[in-house]
Amino acid sequence: MVRLLTYNVHRCVGTDRRLDVGRVAEVIAAQSPDIVALQEVDVGRARTGGVDQAHRIAQRLGMAFHFNAAFTVEEERFGDAILTTLPERLVKAGPLPGHPRFPQLEPRGALWVEIETAAGVLSVINTHLGLVPREQRLQAVALAGTEWVGAAAPGAPLVLVGDMNATPRNAAYRILAARMSEARRAAPFSHRAPTFPSTFPVLAIDHVFASEAVVVDAVRTPLDPLSRLASDHLPLIVDLSLGARTPA
């Protein structure tokens, strides 16, 4: 079994508006994940004290990491990271398309890392989709297409994870769910596992989509006081096994 945790850390600013990288790392450590996918990570930004949050969290967890800047302003970067205790290899990092009619929107990107588990190699693609539905659709199509999910070897174990800013009613979610199985629905027992807002979670907008070669064993979100405080999202924890799913 492999435990994966995806978490929008809101630049490590909690619902109390306090910046605290340490408590974000504490929330993650409490779940003992093998693989961590983070969104909204600040690296060298003045607003969060110039700290490399990806490095700082990875250091506290004893993990290796890869970071992809969705956008860069001079020396300041903001984006997504994948951390793991397992052997890993960066496959690809790059931008996702924006909507041409909304050039002012925040740029988005994706990060692909191959991770060696005891059962074989697992590809993990981490992303954070935009807020505007038309932009989300373009990004979901790109992720499902030949440059990302479609570039993996046929039948290879792969998960696409992150803050999709989309519920099952959204077009972006449906595009991705048509290509892969969403973890909440693929788990043996169906779970709503809402992740936003952390203080009173009602929306499931953080997701894990799994290929046919990945079995979802369990899905959950922690509801302890620290998890509700450390970020405006809750982490989503998914236990996975590598191997083809048994048809229902």
Segments from the language model and where they lie:
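Membrane-embedded segments
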Residues: G44-A46, A54
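Active-site regions of metal-assisted phosphoester/phosphodiester hydrolases
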Residues: M1-I35, R47, Q59-R60, A64-A248
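A short beta-strand-loop structural module common to alpha/beta enzyme folds
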Residues: A37-D42
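Generic internal hydrophobic packing segments that stabilize the cores of diverse globular domains
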Residues: V51-A54, D80
